[in-house]
Amino acid sequence: MDFSKKTIFTEARSHKKFGGDNLSETDLRAIYELAKLAPTANNSCPLRVVFVNSAESMEQLARCALDFNQEKTRTAGSAAILAYDMDFHTHFATLAPHMKQPTVHSEWPIDRLERFALANANLQAGFMIAATRALGFDCGPMGGFDTAAVKSKFFGDTRWVFNCVVLLGHGDHSALRPRGPRLAFEDACRIT
């Protein structure tokens, strides 16, 4: 597979319409095996993923979407529900044996813990999109879901918090609008 700038960045697009075929379990595992290598603070790895990969589960996910995202969701055969785990710190003994106080996070105020988990899960989410594209698939990342419904149907008895959904598969390139502009370096960056 070509891990080129074109594949991952310059020619890759966010899709809103897909062909409906689902990915194989091998494909989903390959995406995760690359995405899990994302950098996170103290190797915290708070991202949790529910791969939705059957017609029945995709329909359940579509029903959790707000009106404007339901049809988009129904066009995809697979999706990744991305969440962050508020109990991420319970894995530090395995993930970060170098830490002197691996349980200190459990004493943090809930808002600080959530900011930490979300920031690091977002790093991993970016890698998830890059990994999916690198393996030759298209993505459709989006919010716009009833988070309580997603939690009820897909997260069960966990402390996972909904972040976003990424539709997966082969996008319908004919349904794409022209790429929107991006901010110039001078408008978005500073060098000090």
Briefly describe each language-model feature range.
Residues 54, 151-152, 159:
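Short Asp/Glu-rich motifs
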Residues 173-192:
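C-terminal domain-closing interface element
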Residues 35-37, 80, 99-153:
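Small-aliphatic-rich amphipathic alpha-helix that forms the alpha element of a beta-alpha
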Residues 66-68, 97-98, 156, 182-183:
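Short, solvent-exposed amphipathic alpha-helical segments in soluble enzyme
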Residues 1-91, 189-192:
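N-terminal amphipathic, basic helical "cap/leader" segment at the start of enzyme domains
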Residues 70-73, 79-82, 156-175:
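A glycine-rich helix N-cap at a beta->alpha junction
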Residues 88-104:
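Carboxylate-rich helix-loop segments that flank metal/cofactor sites and access channels
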Residues 63-64, 94-95, 153:
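Residue-level signal for well-ordered alpha-helical positions
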